[in-house]
């Protein structure tokens, strides 16, 4: 089997349809569609490939999961820039539509907050925050920087937070 954890539906669909034809000599394919990011999208097509999509509000998140379900995704993948509210909306909508959830630990959350709500925690990036002796202080600092970010690339914001708090 092959699991694709981030790509735009319009680019994935032709390949997946070909691989899923009855006479295809191909592995089973499970796909999530785009990375579900927050107001700021890391993989926005600027300096990195466009494989993410914005979910700035709970309403956008709910609608996106319904659209992805109708597009035939096998699961969803939540990325790093979502707020706790959007994260909850995405996981609740996925549960409603019986879609498994893969996720990175969002920068706005800790592993202990996000982990219980997902089926697969990817790469364990950001898990170190929960392991630090000053976890609460580091988390508050991260939230302050996230909440004060007004515009710019999600990639830049994410990278600056990782650099700032690299352990």
Model-identified regions with their sequence ranges:
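Divalent-metal coordination cores built from histidine and acidic residues
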Residues: 1-167
């Amino acid at each position: 089997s092959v699991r694709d954890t981030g790509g735009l539906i319009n680019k994935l669909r032709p390949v997946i349809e070909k691989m899923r034809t009855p006479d295809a000599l191909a592995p089973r394919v499970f796909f999530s569609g785009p990375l579900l990011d927050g107001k700021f999208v890391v993989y926005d097509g600027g300096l990195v490939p466009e494989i993410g999509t914005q979910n700035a509000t709970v309403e956008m998140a709910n609608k996106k999961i319904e659209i992805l379900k109708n597009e035939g995704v096998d699961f969803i993948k939540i990325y790093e820039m979502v707020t706790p509210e959007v994260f909850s909306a995405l996981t609740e909508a996925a549960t409603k539509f019986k879609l498994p959830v893969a996720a990175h630990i969002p920068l706005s959350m800790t592993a202990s907050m996000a982990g219980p709500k997902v089926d697969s925690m990817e790469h364990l990036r950001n898990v170190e925050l929960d392991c630090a002796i000053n976890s609460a202080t580091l988390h508050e600092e991260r939230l302050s920087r996230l909440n004060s970010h007004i515009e710019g690339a999600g990639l830049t914001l994410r990278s600056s937070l990782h650099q700032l708090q690299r352990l």
